[in-house]
């Protein structure tokens, strides 16, 4: 089989918005100052991902010379997030629970004020992508998703793009995560003959930040197709170029 082409784009839920920026900026700044300190874990500063890059990846796509990108953008614009979530919640409601509500005489009242966001995310903890924490190259925070609604929503989005032939089908479950540390961005380290990623002993970091809350109850505002390779911004931050996005409403 020919090798799979390198990914050029990804579908994601961006995590940085007007509501989350202050929370994430404070959390990431404190984390950065701690783990990069020579008196603490002495992690190379380049390994800590910039604020503007934080997102939840749904899937990656390959569009050499941008071939197929137009189709992906068109598909994105046909999505109706509210309808997708309504279908998920309808499937979650069992006949037994629906019957119990009717017996109690529960009725749905019209909410006062602005409607609640369709999806909100709390980002918590720190985990190693590698099975051995003492030789980690990627550390990530997980969204709190007790009912599994966020995961099912993202799985529906991924399936839509896979069925259209725009995203490769992977034989592994979707792991929603926000990358906090990735040592691939550390320059000038000897990576050996095979150009392997440098690794860190993350055991102490994982112990310290296992219950750390990065942001809490932040509304998800967009679904986006972004281009691989974060770009430097005028304010010194980094961010991925957005090819197309839709509102989560």
What does each of the following model-derived ranges do?
Residues 1-249:
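Histidine-dependent nucleotide/RNA phosphoesterase domain, centered on the 2H-phosphoesterase fold
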């Amino acid at each position: 089989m020919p090798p799979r082409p390198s990914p050029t784009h990804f579908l994601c839920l961006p995590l940085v918005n007007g509501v989350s920026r202050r929370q994430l900026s404070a959390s990431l700044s404190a984390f950065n100052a701690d783990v990069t300190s020579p008196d603490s874990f002495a992690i190379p500063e380049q390994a800590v991902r910039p604020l503007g890059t934080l997102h939840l990846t749904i899937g990656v796509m390959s569009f050499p010379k941008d071939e197929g990108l137009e189709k992906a953008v068109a598909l994105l614009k046909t999505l109706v997030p509210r309808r997708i979530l309504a279908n998920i919640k309808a499937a979650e409601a069992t006949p037994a629970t629906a019957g119990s509500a009717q017996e109690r005489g529960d009725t749905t009242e019209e909410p006062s004020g602005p409607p609640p966001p369709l999806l909100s995310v709390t980002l918590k903890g720190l985990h190693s992508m590698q099975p051995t924490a003492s030789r980690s190259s990627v550390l990530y925070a997980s969204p709190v998703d007790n009912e599994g609604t966020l995961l099912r929503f993202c799985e529906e989005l991924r399936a839509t793009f896979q069925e259209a032939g725009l995203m490769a089908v992977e034989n592994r479950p979707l792991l929603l995560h926000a990358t906090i540390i990735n040592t691939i961005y550390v320059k000038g380290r000897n990576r050996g003959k095979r150009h392997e990623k440098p690794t860190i002993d993350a055991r102490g970091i994982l112990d310290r930040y296992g219950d750390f809350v990065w942001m809490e109850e932040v509304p998800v505002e967009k679904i986006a197709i972004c281009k691989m390779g974060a770009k430097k911004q005028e304010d010194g931050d980094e961010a991925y170029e957005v090819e197309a996005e839709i509102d989560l409403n």
